[in-house]
Amino acid sequence: MLNRTLAFSLPILALLAAGTARAETVSVFCAPTEYDLCIKAASAWKDKTGNEAKINKMPQLLDDAIPLYQQLLAAKSTDVDVLFLDVIWLGMFKANLLDLSTLIPKADQDAHFPSTLAAAKLDDKLVAMPAYMDVGLMFYRKDLLEKYGKPVPKTWAELTVTAKEIQDKERADGKPDIWGYAWQAKSYEGLTCDAIELVSSNGGGNIIADDGKVTIDIPAAVEAITMAKGWIGTISPEGVLNYDEEASRAVFESGNAVFHRNWPYVWGTSHATGSAVIDKVGMMPLPVGKAGEKSSGCLGPMYYGVSKFSSKPEVAASFVDFVTGSDMQKMRAVDAAFNPSIPALYTDADVLKKIPFLKDNQQAFSDSAVRPSGYTGTSYNRVSQAFYRTVHDMLSGDAEVAPGLKDLAAKLEKLKESR
């Protein structure tokens, strides 16, 4: 009997030992503001697969991770498996990221917004999977639009007229500090986002097309930037030329702007203690430049990708599939109000309770505009810098729009080839 028991038990022990041997550990980079969420996701993945994810906290300023990534990838280090990536880094690191197209189930890929997934498809490879997304949105004083009987504007021209009318009437009513529109016109990456939104929604593309064609020196772009230049000093203060997200948000949340372009996080901050506009805020996709064009909020999602030098590519890809999947995206939305990149979650009751505006703004995520980081790759930062500096000069009156865009196009033709 003992012999029979041993004979029966040995194969089971062997299977258990084999199962233990198959357990793997992958090294994962995570944003510092999301560390607790990453730990929670790693725990859930271990419960499901038996594998472990070692979570490494990235620098507080995410851009400081770029030289760290460059060093690790240049050394072909196997110390890191999974990288946390900004959308504009994908082109920069695409040569060192694993193609996930055959490692992530097609159904899981298709669950995401097409534009979000498309931003990670470079050189016919899927170099990363979306973790969550941001997109430029328009916030507005719904109480003031109701007060003056104004509909939500559908075009930038309508916004311009409505902003000026309400601004002037509110000033006449004893509110001298109010402006029609607060946005980001400082000379920095945020202006690249704002300007691309204007140009793209006017049918002008996104500076450089996916095939490498420079598209900025065209009438649609001239028209869009000229319109924005006209806002300075009329519906936007001169100080907007130094506004980033936080400076413009402060103006809106103090009650001194009718319209405000920013990222989805402003929904939460505008309803927080200290805001002067609690329960007075509406939100909508950005207007279009011309009828028939798409609202083109700048796409700002974050991704997870796998290092090409990982010694455990299949396991690392499995973690990426898990952490970017529906369950973990719902967890991030409910726990911390992160915006999912999976459309199905936009009708989820638990998610909508936490982020109620999602049900009204799904189209903004679907129609978003992509910065040209895919084609430009490692030269993206130089391309963006040339763009936002040129646009800032135009807005401030230091350069004419049409000649400035022509000169910019010539400069971009050279910069794009140094990718």
Whereabouts are the PLM-identified features?
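Extracytoplasmic/periplasmic solute-binding protein
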Residues: 127-131, 136, 160-213, 257
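Short, polar/charged alpha-helical segment
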Residues: 33-54, 387
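Glycine-centered hinge/linker elements that transmit conformational signals in sensory
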Residues: 163, 210-241, 286
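Extracytoplasmic "Venus flytrap"/periplasmic binding protein-like
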Residues: 44-112, 119-121, 143-154, 251, ...
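A structural signal for short loop-to-beta-strand junctions that line the ligand-binding cleft
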Residues: 71, 79-81, 108-144, 179-180, ...
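Hinge/lid segment of periplasmic solute-binding proteins
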Residues: 86-135, 176-179, 191-194, 278-284, ...
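Short, well-ordered beta-strand elements
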Residues: 24-33, 51-58, 81-82, 127, ...
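C-terminal lobe and pocket-closing loops
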Residues: 265-278, 289-389, 417-419
